């Protein structure tokens, strides 16, 4: 998100600006760096002033005028936008598209392979419960409002969160999901470096379609 500054239209325009991130090593910031470097020849890590911190702190710094822009989780962004002071500069999905990368899963539940083999019924029960929740989130508008109230979200903010997040939930992996993840990794590795990712390549067999 950025303040309503017409001079900031792309991530490349963050050059020389103050920008808030929740972690310099996060995938979000690595994607932002990759787009800025490949599309606008800007190294955000060196050519912008980066402030790390939690989302509420970044919001407060934006309100104080100490930042020109900030990352914002989609559970926070609707409330910031509702103030009328901020607008969306780019979404993570926009950055992926700008890099010419395929849509890929972003967050995962991971299981130890040996445990899965030893407890297939438990694994299946978890996946079934996950499917139930995804179906609920995709179809039940009121569920978002009710859960939002528990999180102190006004109804209009919860509705904004619903609009932002609902389409991001995946119910199953596509047949090309593992290959797509590897392509994203290979594109971002030169930006982040193996020290951030903790490996230089993704091994085969990290996903299974057996429990879909």
Predicted segments, located by residue:
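Residues that form or immediately flank small-molecule/cofactor binding pockets and catalytic motifs
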Residues: 6, 24, 55, 93-94, ...
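Secondary-structure end/capping motifs
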Residues: 116-194
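Helix N-cap/coil-helix junction residues
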Residues: 8, 41-44, 153, 193-199
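Conserved C-terminal helix/tail region of periplasmic/extracytoplasmic solute-binding proteins
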Residues: 182-212
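Bilobed "Venus flytrap"/periplasmic-binding protein-like clamshell domains
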Residues: 1-3, 8-82, 178, 182
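A diffuse structural propensity rather than consistent per-protein peaks
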Residues: 9-10, 174, 207-208
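Short secondary-structure capping/turn micro-motifs that flank functional sites
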Residues: 78-79, 96-97, 154, 164, ...
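Pocket-lining segment of extracytoplasmic ligand-binding domains
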Residues: 56-149
């Amino acid at each position: 998100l950025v303040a309503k500054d017409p001079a900031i239209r792309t991530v490349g325009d963050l050059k020389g600006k103050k920008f808030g991130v929740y972690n310099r090593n996060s995938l979000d910031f690595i994607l932002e760096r990759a787009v800025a470097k490949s599309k606008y020849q800007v190294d955000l890590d060196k050519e912008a002033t980066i402030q790390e911190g939690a989302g509420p702190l970044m919001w407060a710094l934006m309100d104080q005028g100490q930042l020109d822009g900030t990352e914002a989780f989609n559970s926070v962004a609707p409330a910031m936008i509702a103030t009328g002071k901020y607008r969306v500069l780019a979404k993570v999905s926009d950055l992926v598209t700008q890099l010419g990368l395929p849509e890929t899963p972003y967050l995962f539940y991971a299981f130890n392979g040996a445990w899965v083999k030893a407890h297939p019924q438990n694994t299946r029960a978890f996946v079934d419960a996950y499917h139930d929740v995804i179906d609920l989130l995709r179809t039940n508008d009121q569920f978002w409002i009710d859960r939002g109230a528990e999180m102190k979200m006004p109804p209009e903010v919860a509705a904004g969160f619903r609009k932002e997040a609902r389409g991001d939930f995946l119910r199953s992996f596509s047949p090309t999901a593992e290959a797509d993840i590897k392509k994203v990794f290979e594109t971002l590795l030169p930006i982040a470096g193996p020290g951030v990712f903790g490996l230089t390549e993704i091994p085969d067999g990290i996903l299974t379609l057996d429990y879909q």
